[in-house]
A protein has these predicted regions:
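Helical (often loop-to-helix) elements that flank the catalytic cores of nucleotide-handling enzymes
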Residues: 44-50
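Catalytic/regulatory signature loops of cyclic-dinucleotide turnover enzymes
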Residues: 82, 105-130
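Short alpha-helical functional segments enriched in proximate histidine and acidic residues
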Residues: 16, 58
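Intrinsically disordered, glycine/charged-rich C-terminal tails and inter-domain linkers
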Residues: 119-168
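Catalytic core of nucleotidyl cyclases, primarily class III adenylyl/guanylyl cyclases
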Residues: 20-44, 64-103
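Amphipathic alpha-helical transducer elements in NTP-driven molecular machines
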Residues: 10, 52, 104-110
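Conserved long alpha-helical elements within nucleotide-processing catalytic cores of c-di-GMP signaling
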Residues: 1-11, 26
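Serine endopeptidase catalytic core focused on the charge-relay Asp
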Residues: 55
Length: 168
């Protein structure tokens, strides 16, 4: 039964990513890693935000009510997003059997941002915040974190890299 739940979760998250013009790169345990590219970086950032909101709605309105019917505990997701250059890498020479991965500072930062999120929370890095539409920016609040909890800095200035919380 647990395998069916995890499989259903992964399938729903992958569908949501695809519906928002993203790509589901891989599934790691109960985590889904997706990425968004577009002709316009602004559009890609907004699509990623919409996808994150949709994923939480899927959990709250789709998956968890079904789990509740069978007396299973609810599942919660934590979303972390960042923006920047990454590199897509293929491990192996056989196109059918090789593994594809995405590497780079933005992927690393997205994982760190996600690690700071609470269940059913969307957190984004400053580089995403700068790219999203001003109307969407109004739904985010800069998160105050102690340097003991959040140590990540801009490489060029050394200033603390801000993260923002979705509040609306």
């Amino acid at each position: 039964k647990v395998a069916v739940i995890i499989s259903s979760f992964a399938q729903e998250m992958a569908i949501s990513i695809k519906q928002h013009n993203g790509f589901a790169l891989k599934f790691v345990g109960d985590a889904v890693i997706g990425y968004f590219i577009d002709v316009s970086t602004l559009l890609a950032a907004d699509k990623a935000i919409e996808c994150a909101k949709n994923m939480i709605a899927i959990m709250e309105k789709g998956i968890n009510p079904i789990l509740n019917e069978y007396d299973y505990p609810p599942l919660y997701i934590k979303v972390g997003l960042d923006f920047g250059m990454n590199m897509i890498v293929r491990y192996g020479s056989d196109k059918q059997k090789s593994h594809v991965d995405i590497l780079g500072p933005a992927m690393n930062m997205a994982a760190k941002v996600q690690n700071m999120a609470k269940p059913q929370q969307i957190l984004i890095g400053a580089d995403v915040y700068k790219k999203i539409h001003p109307a969407t920016q109004k739904n985010f609040k800069k998160k105050t974190l102690s340097e003991a909890r959040w140590k990540y800095r801009y490489r060029d200035s050394g200033k603390l890299y801000p993260i923002y919380e979705y509040v609306s």
